[in-house]
């Protein structure tokens, strides 16, 4: 659940960045949230958090290649409940993607010698995803629990059998 929520919210930020230059939250072509819709939502603060991630994409002028590597790193930041068959192989894979992100940042023509700072900003952005995703999962769990509490169960004797 955590990995799925992480990827979904990161992808939402990317779509918002690409389709609306982060002016709106772009869930889907027919579901775009402006500030007013965010306010009407029960998850206004979470929408603001997702919007902030998208605004960071604009500020950093994130490339698709950086986004893709960061997405993989988000996946690799979650260890399965059952553990790993090979912790060493997992760490090696994660380290390789971190190195790849560092290479990508170094090759970026817009950096002009500030690659270490950009790398720091990108990894800081990844770190900020974890708090947001934890809050999103908590909201989903709370909403699920509330919906379960509102379920009405009727005694079996009230059930009407269909006429045959």
Curated annotation (Swiss-Prot):
**Which GO BP terms, alphabetically?**
nuclear receptor-mediated steroid hormone signaling pathway; regulation of transcription by RNA polymerase II
Q: Which GO terms describe its cellular component?
A: chromatin; endoplasmic reticulum membrane; nucleus
Per the record, the similarity remark reads: Belongs to the nuclear hormone receptor family. NR3 subfamily.
Question: Which residue numbers delimit the NR LBD domain?
Answer: 1-162
> Know the name of this protein?
Mineralocorticoid receptor
Residues annotated as binding progesterone are: 15, 143
Q: Which UniProt keywords apply?
A: Cytoplasm, DNA-binding, Endoplasmic reticulum, Lipid-binding, Membrane, Nucleus, Phosphoprotein, Receptor, Steroid-binding, Transcription, Transcription regulation
Regions crossing the membrane: none
Alphabetical list of InterPro entries matching this protein: NHR-like_dom_sf, Nucl_hrmn_rcpt_lig-bd, Nuclear_hormone_rcpt_NR3
| Amino-acid positions noted as binding 21-hydroxyprogesterone in the UniProt annotation, renumbered to this chain | 15, 143
Instruction: Name the job this protein performs.
Output: Receptor for both mineralocorticoids (MC) such as aldosterone and glucocorticoids (GC) such as corticosterone or cortisol. Binds to mineralocorticoid response elements (MRE) and transactivates target genes. The effect of MC is to increase ion and water transport and thus raise extracellular fluid volume and blood pressure and lower potassium levels.
Question: Quick check: keyword Hydrolase in the entry?
Answer: no
Molecular function (GO) terms listed? estrogen response element binding; nuclear receptor activity; steroid binding
Its lineage reads: Eukaryota, Metazoa, Chordata, Craniata, Vertebrata
Tell me the subunit arrangement.
Heteromultimeric cytoplasmic complex with HSP90, HSP70, and FKBP4, in the absence of ligand. After ligand binding, it translocates to the nucleus and binds to DNA as a homodimer and as a heterodimer with NR3C1. Binds the coactivator NCOA2. May interact with HSD11B2 in the absence of ligand. Binds the coactivators NCOA1, TIF1 and NRIP1.
**Protein's cellular compartments:** Cytoplasm; Nucleus; Endoplasmic reticulum membrane
């Amino acid at each position: 659940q955590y990995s799925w929520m992480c990827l979904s919210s990161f992808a939402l930020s990317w779509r918002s960045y690409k389709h609306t230059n982060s002016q709106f939250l772009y869930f889907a072509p027919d579901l775009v949230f402006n500030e007013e819709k965010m306010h009407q939502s029960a998850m206004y603060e979470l929408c603001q958090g997702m919007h902030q991630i998208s605004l960071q994409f604009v500020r950093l002028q994130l490339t698709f290649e950086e986004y893709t590597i960061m997405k993989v790193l988000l996946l690799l930041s979650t260890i399965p409940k059952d553990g790993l068959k090979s912790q060493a192989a997992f760490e090696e894979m994660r380290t390789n993607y971190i190195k790849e992100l560092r290479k990508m940042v170094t090759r970026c023509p817009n950096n002009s010698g500030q690659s270490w700072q950009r790398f720091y900003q990108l990894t800081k952005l990844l770190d900020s995803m974890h708090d947001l995703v934890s809050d999103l999962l908590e909201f989903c769990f709370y909403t699920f629990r509330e919906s379960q509490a509102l379920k009405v169960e009727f005694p079996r004797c009230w059930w009407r059998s269909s006429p045959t």
